[in-house]
C-alpha cells in the first residue's frame, strides 16, 4: 500500500543533495569615524581595504598584516550593500529549505547592533533583521504559495536566557528560561514563538522586543548592548508533489547579535565590569569551539556556554553560516581590531555540511501534532484528577527507568571513588616516605655543601697567601736593586737640573720681558687702528646725516615756497571776494532805495485815494441821501475797505521782505568781512610761525654742527627731540588751521546758499504780490467804473483823475518791480561769480591739503633717518665701549699675568727644586750567598734533599733542610701533584684523578757550572737534571719594635700548634697512603726559601718577614719538601687545601730564573687517557736506563680556573693556569724533554692491575666537573 509517508521519504531521497563541506563565510565591515573621534581630530587609519574588497591590510608594530575574507565593506558602505552581499544568499537558501545563521561579532562600539537592527522607521538605515523580513515576505508573496512564518526573540544576559517576546506581566518579564537536552538537541520549551501574517506586525513586535534588551553606557558607547541576542525566523512553505500530496518545506534563519568584546580596563567599574567578564567568558567559549573545530579536535566544548548550546548546529553542523566582523578604524582600538580579525579568520576555516531539511507531508505533521495534543491532554487530565502534580503511567515508568539507570551509574562511580581513595592513600604514604628521604638527603647535602664551602674558603686563603708572598718577594728583590740605581741617577740628575734651572731663569726672564714689550706694542697698535677705523666710521655717519639733512631741508624749502604761493593765492582770493561783494552791497543799497521809493509812492497813493474818497463821499452822500440805496452804499464801502486792506497788506509784506533782505545782506557782508579778517590774520600768523621754524631749524643745525664732535649722542637726541617737537607742532597747527578753514568755508558756503535761496524766494513773493495788487486794483476800478456809471460827472472826472494817478502809480510800481527784478538778476550773477571764486578757493585748499599730505609723507622719512642715525651711533658707541673695555681688560690681564709670571718664576723654580735630605736610614746593598743544593746520585735513597736558605739581616744564620725533613714538617696529602716546570698543583674536589705528565720545564740560567752542563748533556740522553742555585738573593729589612716582634712570635707559635694538629691527623691515613706510594731513587731538587722551617727565629728574620705577613708553613715548604710520586686519593672531602691552585709569582735566584706556566683548559680533553697510556709506556722504558728519575703524583683535576701570570722581569716570570697535565723538562734557553719513570710493580695497585685500568676505573667512579 502506498502511503504519504513513503512518498515523502522518496521525494526527500530524490531531492537530497550530495553532502559537501562548505566553509563559513566571513565578512568584515569597517565603521566610519564617530563624532567624538572627528572632534578630537583623529585622521590616521591603521586599516586599509584592498581594491578587490577582499583583503584587509593592517599596520601593527612596524609590520603590515594581511587578512583575506570573502568580502570587506569599507567605511562608505551602506546597509543595503551589506544585506545584498552577505545576507541575501542565505535568505534564498532558507526559502529552499536550509537552515541558516548569521553572526555579527566585534568590539563594543563598532556598529554590531546598527548592522543587525539599524534605525526603525528609516528605509536607508534599516538593519539586517527588518530587511530580511521584508525580503522573505516579498519572495513568498511573489511565489504565490501558502506559507507560515514564526518568529522568536531571546537574549542571553549573564548566562541566563530571557524571552523578549513574552507578555508585559512583571512575573514573566524577568523570569529566566530553562534549556533541556533532548535527542534532537537543546530546546527551550518555554520560549514563545509568534505566528506572523504580515511584515508590519513582525516589525512592530521587533521594535518592542528590542526596547526590552539590556543596554548600558560604557566608555566605548553611550548605549551599548550588554547581552547576546538571537532573532529566529522559521518559514513553512506548502508545496504539492507530483502525486498531488501536500508537502511542507521548512527553513530556519538565526540572526545573532553578539555582545561586544571589550577590554576590562575600559569597561568601567562594578556592574559594567562584571557584565564584561561574563560577556568575555561566553565569547571565550565560542572562540574555543571555533579553534577546536578548525583544529579537528575530538571533543568540542559546546556545553560550556548557553550561546554555544543554542548554536551548536550552526558551528560545524548542517546549517549555512556566515559571520560579519565589525571593526573600528581608530588607532586606539588597534589591538582589539586585530583580535577581531583573527577571530573571524579562524571562524572562516570552520567547515559545515549544509543539508536541506526533510519535506514533511501534511498527514505526518497532523499525526505529530495529534500525538502531542494527546500527550498534553493526558497530563492535563492527571493534573485535574487530584491536587498536586500527577503523571501518566508511561511518563512515570520512563522516569523510574531513568532513576534506576542513574542509581546504577552512581553505585559504579562510588566503587570507582573507593578504589581511587585507596590508591590515593597508598600514594600519600609513599609520598610521605619519599619526602622524608628527600629531606634527609637535602640535609646531608646542605651539610656537605657547608663543609665543602669551608674547605674551599680555607684553600682560597692559602692560595691567596701563597700568591701574595711569591709576588711580593720577587718584586721586593727587584725594587731594592733598582732603588740604588735610581738613587745614583737622581744625584746626577739633580746636579744637572740645578745648572739647567739657573740657565733657564735668565733665559725665561729675558724672553718674558721681550714678550711683554711685544704685547704692549701690539696692543697700542691695535688701539690706534681701532681709533682710526672709528673716526672713519664717524665721518661716514656724519656725511650720511648731512646728506639726509640737506634733502630734508630742500623738501622743507619747497614746502615753504608752496605755502608762500598758497598764501598769495589766498590774498588774491580775499581781494576778489572784496571786489565781488562790493556790487552786492551796491545792489543792497539800490534795493533799499527802491523799496523806500515804493513805500513813499504807496503812501502817496493811499493818501490821494483817501482824499478822493473823502471828496467823493461827502457830496455823494449829502446830495443823494434819499436816492441812494442801502445796497449800493454797502457795496462801495466794502470795495473801498477791500482796496485799503489790499494796499496795506502789500505795503506790510514789501516792508517785511525788504527788511529781511537787508538783514541777510548785512549778515552776509559781516560774515565775509570777519572771514577775510580771520584769513588775513591766519596768513600773517603762518608767516611768522614759518619764520620762527626756519630760525629754529637754522639754530638747531648750527648747534648740532658745533657739538657733533664733542657730544655726538646727546646732540643727536636733543636735535631729534627738538626737530620732532617742532615738526609735530607745525604739522598739528597746520592740520588744525586747515580743518578750521575747511569748516569756515563750508559754513560760509552753506550760509550764502541759504541767503541766496531766501532772496530768490522773497523776490518771487514780491513779484506775485505786485501782480496780485495790480489785478485787484484793476478789478476794483472796473467794479467802480461799472457800478458808478450813474454817478455825477464831477465824480467821474475826479475818478478819472484818480484813475490816471493810480495808473501812474501802478506804472511806477511796475517799473519798481522791473528794476527789482534786474537787481535780483544782477545779484544772482554776482552770487554765481562769488560761488566760482569760492570753488577756485576750494581748489587752492585742496592743493594745500595735498601739500599737507606730502608733509606727512616727509615725516616718516625724517623719523627713519633719525632712527637709523640713532642706531648707527648707538652701535658705534656700544662697540667703542665694548672694544675699549675688552682692550683695557686684555691689556691689564696680559700685563698682570706677565708680571705675575715674571715675579713667580724665580720663586717657583726655587720651590720646584727639591733637594733630597740625607736621612741615614736608606739601606745599603747586601749580598746574600745562596749555596747550591746537595745532589745525590744513589738510586736507593727515597728522596733527594732540597736545601732551603734562611737569610737574616746579618746573613749569619743559614739553615739547610732536606726534602725528608720538609715532608715531615709539612701537612701535605697524597692527593696533590707538583709540576716542577709550571708549578702546578691540582686539588681534586669530588672528581676523578688524572695523572699529571710534565711536558716542559724551562730554566733560564745566565751562569751554569760544569755540573749543570753535564747534567744538561745527560738530560738530552733522557736523564733527570738537578737545578743549580749558586747565586745570591738580595733582601731588604725594616726595623721592628718589641711589641711587633712579640706579636709575630705569638703568631708563629700558633701556626706551629696548628701544624702539629694536622700532622697527628695525617698519621691516621699513612697506612692507606703507603699502599699507593711509589718511591724511586732519583728526585728533582729545587732551591727555595722556607722561612718557617727552623723553630728558632731571630729578630732580623722577623724583620725580613715583615715585608710579607706570616703565612702557614705549607706555603713554601710544600714546594721544597713534597716527594713527587703517584698517590691514590682516599676520601677527597677530607683532603687539606692546596695553595698551588691559583699560583701566580716567580722565584729568582740571582740571574737564574724558573718560568712556571700551565696550558689552557681549552685543549682537547678527549685524548687525555691515550696520552696518559702512551706516556706511561714510554716512562716504563726510560726508567730502566735512567739513573735519576722524576716521579710525578697522580691527582684529580679541579674545575677550570684561569689566572694571568705576573712577569716581574724578562728572565723572572711565573705564569700559572689550570690546564691538562703537561710534561716537565729542564733546559738552558731550550726545551729538553725529560721522561718520567713510573714504577711498574703490580702489588701497589693490587691484583696486578695496570695504571691505565686503574685510571679508567677512577674516571668512571668520579666524573670530572
UniProtKB/Swiss-Prot annotation:
Q: Where in the cell is it found?
A: Cytoplasm, Cytoskeleton
Gene behind this chain?
Answer: kif13
Region annotated Disordered sits at: 918-1026, 1085-1119, 1127-1146, 1158-1214, 1245-1265
Q: Which domain of life is it from?
A: Eukaryota
Give me the segments passing through the membrane: none
* One annotated Gene Ontology cellular component of this protein: spindle microtubule
Question: Which intervals carry biased composition (Acidic residues)?
Answer: 1158-1169
Q: Which GO terms describe its molecular function?
A: ATP binding; microtubule binding; plus-end-directed microtubule motor activity
What is this protein called in UniProt?
Kinesin-related protein 13
The function of this protein is: Microtubule-associated force-producing protein that plays a role in organelle transport. Its motor activity is directed toward the microtubule's plus end. Cooperates with dynein to control the spindle elongation rate, but is dispensable for mitosis.
Q: Where is the composition biased (Low complexity)?
A: 930-951, 1100-1119, 1128-1146, 1174-1195
Short name of one Pfam family = Kinesin
Starting at the broadest rank, the lineage of the source organism is: Eukaryota, Amoebozoa, Evosea, Eumycetozoa, Dictyostelia
Query: What InterPro entries does the entry give?
Result: KIF11-like, KIF11-like_kin_motor_dom, Kinesin_motor_CS, Kinesin_motor_dom, Kinesin_motor_dom_sf, P-loop_NTPase
**Does this UniProt record's set of keywords contain Nucleotide-binding?**
yes
Q: Which CDD domains match?
A: KISc_BimC_Eg5 (cd01364)
Q: Which family is annotated?
A: Belongs to the TRAFAC class myosin-kinesin ATPase superfamily. Kinesin family. BimC subfamily.
Domain Kinesin motor positions:
23-350
Amino acid at each position: 500500500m502506498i502511503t504519504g509517508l513513503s512518498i515523502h521519504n522518496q521525494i526527500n531521497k530524490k531531492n537530497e543533495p550530495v553532502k559537501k563541506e562548505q566553509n563559513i563565510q566571513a565578512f568584515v565591515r569597517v565603521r566610519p569615524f564617530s563624532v567624538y573621534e572627528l572632534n578630537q581630530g583623529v585622521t590616521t587609519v591603521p586599516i586599509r581595504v584592498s581594491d578587490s574588497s577582499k583583503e584587509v591590510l593592517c599596520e601593527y608594530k612596524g609590520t603590515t598584516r594581511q587578512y583575506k575574507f570573502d568580502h570587506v565593506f569599507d567605511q562608505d558602505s551602506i546597509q543595503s550593500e551589506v544585506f545584498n552581499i552577505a545576507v541575501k544568499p542565505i535568505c534564498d537558501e532558507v526559502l529552499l529549505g536550509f537552515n541558516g545563521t548569521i553572526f555579527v561579532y566585534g568590539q563594543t562600539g563598532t556598529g554590531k547592533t546598527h548592522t543587525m537592527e539599524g534605525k526603525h522607521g528609516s528605509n536607508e538605515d534599516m538593519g539586517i533583521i527588518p530587511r530580511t523580513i521584508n525580503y522573505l515576505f516579498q519572495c513568498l508573496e511573489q511565489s504565490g504559495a501558502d506559507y507560515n512564518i514564526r518568529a522568536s526573540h531571546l537574549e542571553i544576559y549573564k548566562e541566563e536566557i530571557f524571552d523578549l517576546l513574552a507578555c508585559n506581566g512583571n512575573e514573566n518579564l524577568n523570569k529566566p528560561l530553562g534549556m533541556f537536552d533532548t535527542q534532537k538537541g537543546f530546546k527551550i520549551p518555554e520560549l514563545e514563538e509568534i505566528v506572523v501574517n504580515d511584515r508590519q506586525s513582525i516589525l512592530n513586535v521587533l521594535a518592542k522586543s528590542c526596547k526590552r534588551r539590556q543596554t548600558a553606557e560604557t566608555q566605548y558607547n553611550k548605549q551599548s548592548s550588554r547581552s547576546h541576542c538571537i532573532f529566529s525566523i522559521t518559514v513553512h512553505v506548502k508545496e504539492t508533489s507530483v502525486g498531488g500530496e501536500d508537502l511542507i518545506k521548512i527553513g530556519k534563519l538565526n540572526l545573532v547579535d553578539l555582545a561586544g568584546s571589550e577590554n576590562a580596563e575600559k569597561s568601567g567599574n562594578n556592574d559594567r565590569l562584571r557584565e564584561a567578564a561574563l560577556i568575555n567568558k561566553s565569547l571565550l567559549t565560542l572562540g574555543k569551539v571555533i579553534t577546536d573545530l578548525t583544529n579537528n579536535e575530538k571533543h568540542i566544548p559546546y556545553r560550556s556556554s548557553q550561546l554555544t548550546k543554542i548554536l551548536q548546529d550552526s558551528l560545524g553542523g548542517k546549517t549555512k553560516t556566515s559571520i560579519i566582523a565589525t571593526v573600528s578604524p581608530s588607532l586606539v582600538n588597534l589591538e582589539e581590531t586585530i583580535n577581531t580579525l583573527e577571530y573571524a579568520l579562524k571562524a572562516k576555516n570552520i567547515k559545515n555540511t549544509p543539508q536541506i531539511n526533510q519535506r514533511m507531508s501534511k498527514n505526518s505533521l497532523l499525526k505529530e501534532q495529534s500525538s502531542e495534543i494527546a500527550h498534553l491532554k493526558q497530563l492535563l487530565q492527571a493534573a485535574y484528577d487530584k491536587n498536586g502534580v500527577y503523571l501518566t503511567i508511561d511518563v512515570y515508568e520512563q522516569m523510574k527507568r531513568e532513576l534506576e539507570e542513574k542509581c546504577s551509574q552512581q553505585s559504579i562511580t562510588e566503587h570507582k571513588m573507593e578504589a581511587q581513595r585507596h590508591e590515593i592513600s597508598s600514594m600519600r604514604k609513599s609520598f610521605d616516605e619519599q619526602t622524608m628521604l628527600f629531606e634527609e638527603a637535602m640535609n646531608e647535602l646542605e651539610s656537605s655543601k657547608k663543609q665543602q664551602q669551608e674547605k674551599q674558603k680555607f684553600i682560597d686563603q692559602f692560595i691567596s697567601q701563597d700568591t701574595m708572598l711569591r709576588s711580593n718577594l720577587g718584586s721586593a728583590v727587584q725594587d731594592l736593586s733598582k732603588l740604588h740605581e735610581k738613587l745614583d741617577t737622581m744625584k746626577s740628575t739633580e746636579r744637572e737640573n740645578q745648572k739647567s734651572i739657573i740657565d733657564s731663569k735668565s733665559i725665561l726672564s729675558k724672553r718674558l720681558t721681550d714678550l711683554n714689550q711685544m704685547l704692549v706694542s701690539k696692543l697700542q697698535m691695535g688701539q690706534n687702528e681701532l681709533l682710526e677705523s672709528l673716526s672713519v666710521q664717524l665721518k661716514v655717519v656724519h656725511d650720511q646725516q648731512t646728506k639726509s639733512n640737506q634733502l630734508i631741508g630742500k623738501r622743507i624749502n619747497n614746502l615753504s615756497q608752496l605755502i608762500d604761493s598758497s598764501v598769495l593765492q589766498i590774498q588774491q582770493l580775499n581781494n576778489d571776494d572784496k571786489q565781488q561783494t562790493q556790487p552786492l552791497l551796491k545792489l543792497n543799497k539800490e534795493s533799499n532805495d527802491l523799496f523806500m521809493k515804493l513805500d513813499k509812492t504807496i503812501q502817496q497813493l493811499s493818501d490821494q485815494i483817501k482824499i478822493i474818497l473823502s471828496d467823493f463821499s461827502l457830496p455823494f452822500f449829502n446830495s443823494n441821501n434819499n436816492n441812494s440805496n442801502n445796497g449800493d452804499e454797502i457795496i462801495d464801502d466794502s470795495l473801498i475797505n477791500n482796496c485799503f486792506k489790499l494796499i496795506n497788506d502789500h505795503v506790510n509784506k514789501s516792508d517785511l521782505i525788504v527788511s529781511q533782505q537787508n538783514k541777510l545782506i548785512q549778515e552776509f557782508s559781516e560774515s565775509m568781512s570777519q572771514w577775510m579778517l580771520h584769513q588775513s590774520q591766519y596768513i600773517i600768523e603762518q608767516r611768522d610761525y614759518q619764520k620762527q621754524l626756519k630760525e629754529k631749524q637754522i639754530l638747531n643745525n648750527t648747534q648740532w654742527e658745533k657739538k657733533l664732535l664733542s657730544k655726538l649722542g646727546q646732540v643727536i637726541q636733543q636735535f631729534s627731540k627738538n626737530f620732532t617737537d617742532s615738526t609735530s607742532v607745525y604739522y598739528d597747527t597746520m592740520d588744525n588751521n586747515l580743518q578750521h578753514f575747511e569748516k569756515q568755508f563750508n559754513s560760509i558756503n552753506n550760509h550764502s546758499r541759504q541767503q541766496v535761496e531766501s532772496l530768490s524766494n522773497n523776490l518771487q513773493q514780491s513779484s506775485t504780490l505786485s501782480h496780485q495788487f495790480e489785478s485787484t486794483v484793476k478789478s476794483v476800478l472796473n467794479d467802480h467804473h461799472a457800478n458808478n456809471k450813474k454817478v455825477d460827472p464831477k465824480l467821474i472826472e475826479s475818478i478819472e483823475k484818480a484813475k490816471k494817478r493810480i495808473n501812474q502809480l501802478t506804472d511806477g510800481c511796475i517799473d519798481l518791480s522791473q528794476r527789482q527784478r534786474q537787481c535780483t538778476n544782477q545779484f544772482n550773477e554776482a552770487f554765481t561769480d562769488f560761488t566760482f571764486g569760492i570753488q577756485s578757493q576750494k581748489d587752492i585748499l585742496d592743493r594745500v591739503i595735498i601739500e599737507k599730505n606730502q608733509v606727512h609723507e616727509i615725516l616718516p622719512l625724517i623719523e627713519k633717518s633719525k632712527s637709523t642715525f640713532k642706531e648707527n651711533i648707538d652701535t658705534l658707541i656700544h662697540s667703542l665701549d665694548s672694544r675699549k673695555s675688552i682692550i683695557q681688560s686684555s691689556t691689564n690681564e696680559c700685563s698682570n699675568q706677565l708680571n705675575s709670571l715674571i715675579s713667580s718664576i724665580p720663586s717657583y723654580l726655587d720651590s720646584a727644586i727639591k733637594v733630597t735630605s740625607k736621612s741615614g736610614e736608606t739601606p745599603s746593598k747586601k749580598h746574600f750567598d745562596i749555596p747550591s743544593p746537595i745532589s745525590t746520585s744513589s738510586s736507593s735513597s727515597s728522596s733527594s734533599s732540597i736545601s732551603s736558605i734562611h737569610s737574616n739581616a746579618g746573613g749569619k744564620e743559614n739553615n739547610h733542610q732536606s726534602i725528608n725533613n720538609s715532608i715531615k714538617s709539612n701537612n701535605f696529602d697524597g692527593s696533590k701533584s707538583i709540576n716542577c716546570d709550571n708549578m702546578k698543583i691540582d686539588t681534586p674536589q669530588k672528581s676523578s684523578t688524572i695523572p699529571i705528565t710534565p711536558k716542559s720545564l724551562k730554566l733560564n740560567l745566565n751562569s751554569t757550572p760544569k755540573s749543570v752542563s753535564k747534567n744538561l748533556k745527560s738530560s738530552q740522553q733522557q736523564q733527570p737534571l738537578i737545578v743549580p742555585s749558586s747565586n745570591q738573593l738580595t733582601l731588604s729589612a725594616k726595623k721592628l719594635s718589641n711589641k711587633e716582634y712579640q706579636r709575630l712570635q705569638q703568631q708563629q707559635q700558633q701556626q706551629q700548634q696548628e701544624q702539629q694538629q694536622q700532622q697527628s691527623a695525617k698519621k691516621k691515613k699513612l697506612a692507606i697512603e703507603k699502599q699507593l706510594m711509589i718511591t724511586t731513587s732519583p728526585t728533582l731538587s729545587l732551591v727555595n726559601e722556607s722561612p718557617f722551617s727552623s723553630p728558632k727565629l731571630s729578630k732580623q728574620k722577623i724583620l725580613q718577614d715583615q715585608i710579607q705577613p706570616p703565612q702557614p708553613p705549607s706555603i713554601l715548604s710544600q714546594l721544597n719538601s713534597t716527594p713527587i710520586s703517584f698517590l691514590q686519593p682516599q676520601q677527597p672531602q677530607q683532603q687539606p687545601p692546596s695553595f698551588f691552585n691559583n699560583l701566580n709569582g716567580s722565584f729568582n735566584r740571582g740571574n737564574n730564573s724558573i718560568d712556571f706556566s700551565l696550558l689552557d683548559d681549552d685543549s682537547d680533553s678527549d685524548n687525555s687517557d691515550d696520552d696518559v697510556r702512551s706516556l706511561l709506556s714510554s716512562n716504563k722504558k726510560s726508567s730502566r736506563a735512567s739513573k735519576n728519575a722524576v716521579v710525578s703524583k697522580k691527582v684529580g683535576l679541579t674545575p677550570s680556573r684561569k689566572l694571568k701570570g705576573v712577569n716581574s722581569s724578562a728572565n723572572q716570570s711565573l705564569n700559572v693556569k689550570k690546564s691538562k697535565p703537561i710534561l716537565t723538562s729542564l733546559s738552558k734557553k731550550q726545551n729538553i724533554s725529560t721522561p718520567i719513570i713510573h714504577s711498574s710493580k703490580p702489588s701497589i695497585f693490587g691484583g696486578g692491575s695496570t695504571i691505565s685500568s686503574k685510571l679508567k676505573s677512577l674516571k668512571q667512579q668520579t666524573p670530572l666537573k
